[in-house]
Amino acid sequence: MELRGRRVCVTGLGVSGPPVARALLKHGAHVTVVEGRDDDVNRERARTLRELGATVELGEPTTLPAGTDLVVTSPGWRPDAPVLVAAADAGVEVIGDVELAWRLRPAGQVWLAVTGTNGKTTTVRMLEAMLRADGRRALAVGNVGTPVIDAALADGPDRWDILAVELSSFQLHWSATVQPHAAAIINLAPDHLDWHGGMEPYAAAKAKVYGAGTIRIVNAADPALRELAETHGDPAAPLVGFSLDVPRAGELGLVEDLLVDRAFVANPRTEATELATLADVTPRAPHNVANALAAAALARSIGVAPEAVRTGLRNFQPEPHRIAHVATIDGVDYVDDSKATNAHAAAASLAAYPSVVWIAGGLLKGADVTGLVRQAASRLRGVVLLGADRHQLREALDTHAPHVPVVDVARTDEGAMAEVVAAAARLAQKGDTVLLAPAAASMDMFTNYIERGEAFAREVRALAG
């Protein structure tokens, strides 16, 4: 992709904007960055980029900078943003940071991609551990720390041969030619529907992960996902399933307590290879075992040895606030899954424990929690609700779990989490799990899910003395 002399507009100064601008400048482009928020953080970022030669405009952009012939947008920017509408009207190509990284990547660099509603970060981290255990120069990138553009263009001793790429529906929406060697859709549930305009375009965005020639790896337990892979992927590329069931030929799955590969073997009809045991997967919740199988399928697609899959799983350390055990107090386990910000993630978390005091609530973003409550009702010892939309959860609980005691915490100040944890401790009995799996976003009370999880863990430790 030739960029020298081109006039490129970059939208946004968030996580992806600055590294995209730096990469474009390095390739000789004339760069203008537009950012709607004029605050201290963005003024400092703007100062740094101006020193490198970029033009930066702070304040809500309404027009496309004159002469622009390419737009690289930050993934969260909606297609109806005025500057992007102006680009479309002018016939100017709009791509995302991932698409730019793909076009500029060095020859021979392999991409293995993961998308889905929940579990993406865990899966790419597991994959990274497997690849490194096999001696590969590999890095997990995307929403997990290192921006894709930085990793793809790193050179010298920092160059990466394989990228385990976490891709959101936003990033995929703005991608046109990305063709990973293999890609997995690990699950799909309603999320970001306001941005995409409904479930069908959301699913179609996810399916763009299957480029021409991409090995299609899909959760075989979900017929809708298999259909998505069949209808949107390359029909000439292999289709590999994974599930928690005994695998059929061409799948990865479970045989008793063994993770088994019947896809990447010489004769899938008659052969199977043991990859690991359930004891190698941490935590051993069902949805996390599915993540491990997806990661294993991606690793095996490029010939990673079975022993490296096992070693990688053993070396893997879960990310904070994802089914993280905080403490055991008086026989009660306290678990932080603050990252469970939607109903699908909360349902998976709740399914991992037989008897739960559930801490839930926050911003539901218009999601329907009726099915979640109905599904979880038999596991609930009690519920503690907090946050702006807790009344919606209360209504669902009153209808589908009327026998379950509910404590409603109305306060939203710094002491709210202490009251929440204390109430949960009163409801819990020996052998129970107090589980923070809010099924909601956190911004009504906290900066993000991390701050919410840290507040929970802090109050649990205080309870332990």
Curated annotation (Swiss-Prot):
EC id: 6.3.2.9
Enzyme class: ligase
Superkingdom to which the source organism belongs: Bacteria
Subcellular location: Cytoplasm
Gene Ontology molecular function: ATP binding; UDP-N-acetylmuramoylalanine-D-glutamate ligase activity
GO biological process: cell division; cell wall organization; peptidoglycan biosynthetic process; regulation of cell shape
Residues that coordinate or bind ATP: G116, T117, N118, G119, K120, T121, T122
InterPro entries: Mur-like_cat_sf, Mur_ligase_C, Mur_ligase_C_dom_sf, Mur_ligase_cen, MurD
Catalytic reaction list: UDP-N-acetyl-alpha-D-muramoyl-L-alanine + D-glutamate + ATP = UDP-N-acetyl-alpha-D-muramoyl-L-alanyl-D-glutamate + ADP + phosphate + H(+)
Role summary: Cell wall formation. Catalyzes the addition of glutamate to the nucleotide precursor UDP-N-acetylmuramoyl-L-alanine (UMA).
Name of the molecule in the record: UDP-N-acetylmuramoylalanine--D-glutamate ligase
Species the sequence originates in: Thermobifida fusca (strain YX)
